[in-house]
A protein has these predicted regions:
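Membrane-proximal intracellular helices of multi-pass ion channels
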Residues: 1-580
Length: 580
């Protein structure tokens, strides 16, 4: 437990300056690196002949979709023809059609679900031009959509997708990925273009040690909340995650961007509040107050969202760590003492504490990378990552986690408004029927995809044939696969035989719909609120920047999760726990 607390406290120290930097990048304020990055941005704008004028929400959404679809087409072709000799020293053959479809949708949507093993399924050309490239673009897509939604909610113009997309890559993802990659190389992560190394084991058998540009992929894999591994065992293997230092670096990397989005939201909401005061002549922004404004890190609105997400995260982390520390009841009944907790499927160099933390972080921040085998978690320990993916608001992936939580905030405001008999307002905007219909549609998509496709999988032979575990754990595998796909997470209970036509196509469809339908709806809500006149705050206005509202938000999230997922969870992880 001490390891977990120290790790999280250290993260809180570094996130404040990083969050402040991301805020400056997002709103176009000056930073120390502008002399370099301004030239990079302008060069890209000039070469691609990009019109940097502001867009409507419809044009923003259409631009986002078109860029992603173009990248999918290019990536799919490369996966199919990767057998060419260029950057393919290990002689990897072209990828099969349905697996290519699943893979390219997976990485385009920031899911990184892998129905293949990277060391035997992809050439270096595919790893670099498809996988690593998609890891940058998918993270930038989610972040750009989030910033556009925040602008709309606050009554500002939506901005320009191409500008947001290029700025976050040039000014944040690329430079920080390079720094993280160098740290990983320092700790022993390979970075080369050599073929796999053949060696003879002490048993006299031939074994291949994977090689390649692992550090380059590993850095953006976590920073962009992607999660797909260069190797099949992902960050559980020493080639991707050799030491406790790399483990902490990877933990911090996948937490940085989602938390920074909350900082951006809080600061932008604070800026709007101060502008509103100045415009109403109620408040004069003196030099002293300007200095105070510069010292605001996250703002009250951002703090409320952060507290709500943190409560959800800490509850899940506590349950996972407690369950794994107790060990496996079935193993204890066999007379085996588990002094260090449930170590099945875990790396000794990390132990239960770092494994439980990594598991909770990777499914809360929807990264999907693993440093232990989730299929070997205890039933209650495995319920935590499953539940966090079903919630899909516990910080979430780059940008989209905050977008989902803001939808819940709108719903919470609406419910509270009904209870006190007032018109619901959020961030100074009146929430009316149109916004509520869109918000309800947005949150129902996630459970509908998970439960609908899970029901289909256990109803037809093509789905049942992939289930390798009987009874309750088999259902948990199916639920986990589709929850991971719908949450754009990518981790899995790897006992599932998922490289088949049914699983490749069904998961691909779920990933695509779960990624783009909510984003379009969320941008639509932001576009609707953007055009509304601000409402002045009164004594009867529900304050959304308090601890009380944070607790209300947590309760609303849990109630919705219970109403939608509790029956399925009771038949899976809960039933498995009760029968051990």
């Amino acid at each position: 437990m001490v390891q977990i607390v120290c790790t999280l406290l250290l993260f809180m120290v570094i996130i404040f300056p990083i969050g402040n930097y991301v805020y400056h990048v997002s709103v176009g304020k000056r930073t120390f690196a502008d002399p370099v990055f301004d030239k990079m941005d302008n060069f890209v704008f000039r070469i691609l002949k990009i019109d940097t004028s502001t867009m409507t929400w419809k044009k923003y959404a259409m631009s986002l979709l078109m860029v992603n679809l173009c990248l999918v087409f290019i990536g799919y072709l490369i996966l199919r023809i990767q057998s060419i000799g260029f950057l393919n020293p290990n002689g990897i053959s072209g990828m099969e059609e349905s697996l290519s479809f699943n893979t390219i949708i997976s990485f385009m949507t920031n899911t990184n679900l892998q129905h293949y093993a990277g060391e035997s399924g992809l050439s270096y050309l595919s790893q670099m031009l498809v996988i690593i490239m998609m890891m940058f673009t998918s993270a930038a897509t989610g972040f750009s959509a989030c910033i556009a939604m925040i602008r709309g909610l606050l009554g500002k113009k939506m901005g320009n997708f191409y500008v947001d997309f290029i700025r976050i890559i040039n000014r944040f993802l690329l430079p920080l990925s390079m720094i993280i990659g160098l740290f990983l190389v320092w700790q022993g992560v390979p970075q080369n273009l050599n073929s796999n190394i053949e060696l003879t084991t002490i048993e006299g058998k031939i074994q291949e040690i994977a090689s390649g540009p692992i550090a380059a992929l590993e850095s953006i894999k976590h920073l962009g909340t992607n999660g797909g591994g260069f190797l099949g065992a992902n960050s559980a293997t020493p080639l991707e995650n050799p030491t406790i230092i790399t483990n902490i670096i990877e933990l911090f990397s996948m937490m940085i961007l989602p938390v920074s989005c909350i900082f951006v939201f809080g600061r932008m909401a604070y800026d709007k509040h101060e502008e509103s005061k100045a415009n109403n002549r109620v408040y004069t922004l003196s030099t002293k107050n300007c200095n105070r404004a510069n010292k605001v890190w996250i703002g009250k609105e951002g703090r409320t969202i952060f507290v709500a997400m943190s409560i959800l995260f800490v509850i899940g982390l506590g349950v996972c760590f407690w369950s794994e520390s107790l060990g496996n009841h079935a193993v204890a009944q066999a007379g085996i003492t588990e002094t260090f907790g449930n170590m099945e499927g875990k790396e000794v160099r990390f132990g239960v504490a770092q494994s439980a933390l990594f598991t909770t972080v990777t499914t809360s921040f929807t990264t999907g990378t693993i440093n232990n085998m989730h299929d070997t978690l205890t039933p209650l320990g495995g319920l935590v990552p499953l539940m966090h993916m079903m919630l899909n608001v516990v910080f979430g992936g780059a940008g989209v986690g905050l977008m989902n939580m803001l939808i819940y905030a709108i719903i919470a405001v609406f419910i509270c408004g009904l209870m006190i008999g007032r018109t619901p307002e959020y961030l100074g905007k009146k929430i009316e029927g149109k916004e509520m219909k869109l918000a309800a549609l947005c949150i129902i998509i996630h459970p509908l995809l998970i439960l609908g496709f899970s029901a289909l999988a256990v109803s037809i032979p093509e789905g049942v044939n992939g289930i390798t575990n009987p009874s309750f754990h088999g259902l948990s595998q199916v639920l986990y696969e589709f929850a991971s796909s719908a949450a754009n997470n990518g981790s899995g209970f790897e006992g599932l035989l998922d490289n088949s036509l049914f699983w490749n196509m069904s998961c691909g469809i779920v990933m695509f719909l779960a990624r783009y339908l909510p984003i379009i709806i969320q941008l639509g809500i932001a576009g609707s609120l953007m055009n509304k006149i601000d409402i002045n705050e009164s004594t009867g206005t529900l304050k959304t920047n308090t601890l009380t509202f944070a607790i209300i938000l947590v309760i609303v999230v849990y109630i919705f999760a219970a109403l939608t997922f509790l029956p399925a969870i009771a038949l899976g992880p809960v039933a498995e726990m009760l029968t051990l």
